[in-house]
Amino acid sequence: MRILNMNEYIGLNHYLILSSLVFTIGMLGLFMHRKNIINILMSIELMLLAVNINFVAFSVYMQELSGQIFSIIILTIAAAETSIGLAILLIYFRNKGSIEVTDINQMRG
């Protein structure tokens, strides 16, 4: 029985193309949905995911674990950042009733 090595079929170029597509989708989402703050946060998360795909792809290609470890650290920090951002948005929505970027821009102390 032959064990398949996926590195023979899926090369570094495939991961880089996937990463660039995910980053482009995140960038387009950031530019096209500038009114809703939740869509902006999701687009930023997509862009961070694309960077993590790059780290993992180069880590596998170079046969080092540092890129994968760094990717896990970035995912942990991004999850904490997103949860804090969504908690702030939830409190703001309860007080003001809207989460549009134009309304948040006009916040005053």
Swiss-Prot record:
Q: Which residues form a coiled coil?
A: none
Pfam families per the record?
Oxidored_q2 (PF00420)
| Ranges annotated as spanning the membrane | 12-32, 40-60, 72-92
The listed locations are: Cell inner membrane
Its GO biological process annotations read: ATP synthesis coupled electron transport
In terms of superkingdom, the source organism counts as Bacteria
Predominant location category: membrane
- Give the signal peptide, or none: none
Record keywords: Transport included? yes
What is the membrane topology listed in the Swiss-Prot or TrEMBL record?
A: Multi-pass membrane protein
E.C. number: 7.1.1.-
In the record, what terms sit under GO molecular function? NADH:ubiquinone reductase (non-electrogenic) activity; quinone binding
Q: Which reaction does it catalyse?
A: a quinone + NADH + 5 H(+)(in) = a quinol + NAD(+) + 4 H(+)(out)
Sorted UniProt keywords: Cell inner membrane, Cell membrane, Membrane, NAD, Quinone, Translocase, Transmembrane, Transmembrane helix, Transport
Q: How does it assemble?
A: NDH-1 is composed of 14 different subunits. Subunits NuoA, H, J, K, L, M, N constitute the membrane sector of the complex.
Function, as annotated: NDH-1 shuttles electrons from NADH, via FMN and iron-sulfur (Fe-S) centers, to quinones in the respiratory chain. The immediate electron acceptor for the enzyme in this species is believed to be ubiquinone. Couples the redox reaction to proton translocation (for every two electrons transferred, four hydrogen ions are translocated across the cytoplasmic membrane), and thus conserves the redox energy in a proton gradient.
By what name is this protein known? NADH-quinone oxidoreductase subunit K
Organism for this UniProt entry = Rickettsia bellii (strain RML369-C)
